[in-house]
Every structure is written in C-alpha cells, then in structure tokens.
C-alpha cells in the first residue's frame, strides 16, 4: 500500500502499485488532464511510471518551468521522426534538449539546409497533431543492437554497444517510429505543442571527435506557448543586432583569421578598450590588497602531473616537446599551480595570511573549432585570476570581501544584479569524500556568515573543489556566468604548500580560486553586446570626434582635439572636405559617444556644438566648459568615486 506524499503535504494511500495517471485522477479531473509528467522523490519520470512503495510525487503541467526541458526533449524526437519520414535513408544519432531549445544530429549524404525547414516543420506539426503516445519499452541488449544494425542505424548500434553492461536498454516508441532514449517523456506527441521553430544547421563530428564522421546538426527552439516563442524570437532578433562579432568589425576593434584559429588580433581601438578594463581591474585589486604577479606560460608536464591537471585536463591542453632536452611542456590552461609555486618560494608565516595573489594570466585551452565563437569562446585568453591563501577561519571573511568587490565591479560595468549558484562535487574529482565534505561545508558556512544567498547547481564544481558561480543578466535578459569563487584543500596538499603557524609547526593553507570577469576576451564580448557597442564614455575606445564643417575650421578642430587629449580623452579629428552630415552619420555608425562640430562661428567664439550618440539635438558650449564636462564624464567610476571621497 504505497503512501504518496503530495507537494502540499497531504498523503494518499493506494492498494498496490499505482501510476502517476491514477494518482492524478484521484485528485481531480483537471489535474488528470493537465499532468504531463511527474517527479518521484525529486526525479523526473513518465506519468505512466509505476510506484510500488512510499514516495513523494509532484506533477508537471504545461504551466510549470520544469515542463520546458521535457517539451524540448520530445520536440527533438518529433524532429527525428519527421526527418526520417521525409528522407528514410537518413541515420539518426543523438538529440538532446539544450538551453532554449534542442538539436538532433543526422547522417546523410547530402547535408540539410535551411531550405528544408518548411517541409520538416510541416511534418512535425502532423506528428504533433496525431497525438501519438510515447511508450517506453525495455529491450534485450543483443536484440537492440541487431535491430538497429539491420535498420542500417550504425550510430544507434554503437551507442548501445558502448553502454555499461548493467544498464537497461530503454526504447521509446511513438507509433511506428522509435528511438533509443533514457527518457523521461511527456504523455504524447501532442504535448509538445506547436510553439516550436527550426533555427539553423551546423556541422558536428560524431561524438565531438574530428576523426569521426561529420554529421548535420539541426537546431530548434520550443516553448510552452506561442507567446513565449515570439518573445524568444524577439530576443534573438535583438541579440543579432548586438552580436559582438558584427559590432567588432563595424567599430574596428579586432579580427580573427585562419592562421591563428581561436586567437584574437586586437586592433588599436579594441586594445584601448581592453587596457582600460585591465587598468580598472588592477586598481580594484590594489584597493583590496592583492599583490600582482606574473608566471610562465610554458610549463613542464611534471608540474601538471603533480597538480592533477595532466590526468583531468590533458585533452584540453596545448602540448609541446623539446627534443634536445627530452622534455614535454604545456601551455598553461590556468594559473593556479604556478601561483602555488610562488607561495612555496620561501618560508611563509601565518602573519602573511590571507595572501591575495593576482595575475592577468595568458592561458590556452583547446576548444573544437565548431565550439569557437567570436571573442567569447577562444583558445587563447587572459584571466583576471587570483588566488587567496588563507586559514579555515579566514574563509568567511574573504568570501564576504570578495563578493563586495565583485558587486562593485559589476555595478561599475553596468550590471546591477547577479545570481549566485553553489556548484558541488563533480563525478570526476580529486581528493577524498572527507576533503570534499570539509570544502563544501566551509563554503556553505562562509555564504551563511557573509549573507550570500545561492541556488544549487549540483555536480558542477571544479575537479579540486566546490565553487560559487556568479551569473549576470544582460540588457536583453540573457544570463552570463562570469565570476567564480572556489574552495580548494586539494591543490595545496598535492603541491606541498605550507606556512608556519602560531604553534611553530607547518600547516596547509586553504586556497581560494577567484575570478570576477572570467576572461577579458569573453567579458569584453559581453560588454559589447550589453551596450550594443554604445559604451559609456569612460569605456569607449574613441570618446570624442572633432569634426569640422568647413576647411577654415580645421586649425580650430585640431586645437580642440589637442585640448581634449591634454585632459586625458581619446580623441580623433575629422577635417575632411566631406559634408558634415555624412561625417556625423559615419561616426555615429562607429558608435562614437560624442561628436563636437566646429565651423567658422565656433572658431571665432571658441565654442563647440556637442552631439551625443543617438541624439538629434546639439548643445553649444564654450571650449573650456566642454572639456571640463567631458573630462569629468570620462573618468572611470572608481576614480570618480574616490575623487569625491
């Protein structure tokens, strides 16, 4: 007689094994109609799953956020059936749900193109309208392999062969079509609804390995209703307008080319933006008593073996050999082992703790070419990386100080709110469970003391310790995980870091790994899209253009520019003979925040006509007033703040 506990705390008892369908019907016809799936003891399962013992049950309806992932998962199955209905020779591979949508990878001699989408979407709507039940079946392993091999589905057969011997072979059937899948699924294809759209195609190697066959990946998006779908498409349209790759070209900030895949050629204006941001971060770290260091980029494998990165991270490292010296080295993918070497260099005392060590460290990580994205996902990048060596008793205070610093930085850069995620131990990790218990407990206690509220992000910690992830929301509602704080007891032990305590004995420090921006490259990409290239004056690569109306005003334009430069502004002059409206249009497209227009009258009266980006009106100011106002506005927020103090 299973006792079923519902979310409101009420308990219903049933005579023998019961399904979610039966439980929902016992509560009422409305829920019986609306329930699409359920959670049993926190685990999502099919609505028809049998329950034979006491359990907590929560039903999932279309109104629930949890329904979205299942709608997208089922939409991937509907997509695969539609494709094979239209092109039976196509092999299906895998098709998961992802953020905002789903994809499915197909093997076909002729790759799909967006021109195929109307036919596929029409067939998908037919499958949804058929309202065919999803039925789970458990097959014998050998029978399943033989079935897919006989169908010519070699990829599916390979997937089954690679599954653990003790894993059930779960097959989901929707009418005559079926697929290998762990589930769970909704009740029927009709539960997917019609709020879906195919978005794009891309190439993808089977299992992400370039040595394997190239597949065609079809991406789609799916939502609970048309209103959500339309809102998402509107966000994508806005995101396209803000794409940092396009804006980067238009503003002449950077470029990437085939001879250096995944690495950035910073142009003058882009590098100016980079250095302004780096200088700002350097000042923030100095105010918070960080000592800046610099460590090598190319390091012997012995250090990576000792730290554990060689075992856990080698496939993402760029490795070099030195034949004459019989050495194997790697470009560092992160700075932490090198910072431990500095900490270990000489005898450390408890009086030096906490020791905050920062580096704008150049790192390299291998990313598949298909995963690269502008300057946001690259192979060569610079981290705003720091490591705090401290005692257990100092973790809470250091956490509070870091969060305060992070909040100030984000606010200065235009992000006033952020969320925090607590990521605990991953499946692949270094250190014993006892060490992880200690690390997770310390970080939770630190959050409690520091007043940091968080949501759980299970299994997503670093391989050496749990972490807090700080997630920004941008101007169009997208989330960006940037900052991190990680508690690490493992690396100091592995690399033999120690200090002399008050008792004159050696002790292991705790190592806090922390970053605020993450990488400069990615964060600059985020900033470009946050502001759509229309930066506040202090960040703008070119802050002011002085444009002359007539050639007679060229000398005065140069004088104005020189005066602004002397006040510390980044200024360009435009004394070409082009019409002033053409000049204004050109510099507005380049997203220059301020254009100062000067002609004969302005030269005679020593004034300027100031135009703001996006504004039609001009403000007439004396040269001295304009310089004073712009110099004040162009101050970085932290400098302006401390000037007031």
Swiss-Prot record:
GO BP terms: namely: threonyl-tRNA aminoacylation
What GO MF terms are annotated? Answer: ATP binding; metal ion binding; threonine-tRNA ligase activity; tRNA binding
Q: Which GO cellular component terms, listed alphabetically, does the Swiss-Prot or TrEMBL entry include?
A: cytoplasm
> What does this protein's record comment on cofactor binding?
Binds 1 zinc ion per subunit.
Binding locations of Zn(2+): 336, 387, 513
Reactions catalysed according to its record:
tRNA(Thr) + L-threonine + ATP = L-threonyl-tRNA(Thr) + AMP + diphosphate + H(+)
> Which InterPro entries does this chain map to?
aa-tRNA-synt_IIb, aa-tRNA-synth_II, aa-tRNA-synth_II/BPL/LPL, Anticodon-bd, Anticodon-bd_dom_sf, Beta-grasp_dom_sf, TGS, TGS-like
Enzyme class, top EC level, equals ligase
Q: What is its main location?
A: cytoplasm
Q: Where is the TGS domain?
A: 1-61
Q: Where in the cell is it found?
A: Cytoplasm
Please give the superkingdom of this protein's source: Bacteria
Q: What is its EC number?
A: 6.1.1.3
Record key words, sorted: Aminoacyl-tRNA synthetase, ATP-binding, Cytoplasm, Ligase, Metal-binding, Nucleotide-binding, Protein biosynthesis, RNA-binding, tRNA-binding, Zinc
The cofactors it requires, by name, are:
Zn(2+)
> Which residue stretches belong to region Catalytic?
243-536
On assembly, the entry states: Homodimer.
Q: Identify its protein family.
A: Belongs to the class-II aminoacyl-tRNA synthetase family.
User: What task does this protein carry out?
Assistant: Catalyzes the attachment of threonine to tRNA(Thr) in a two-step reaction: L-threonine is first activated by ATP to form Thr-AMP and then transferred to the acceptor end of tRNA(Thr). Also edits incorrectly charged L-seryl-tRNA(Thr).
Q: What is this protein called?
A: Threonine--tRNA ligase
Q: Which organism is it from?
A: Gluconobacter oxydans (strain 621H) (Gluconobacter suboxydans)
Whichever gene encodes this chain, its name is thrS
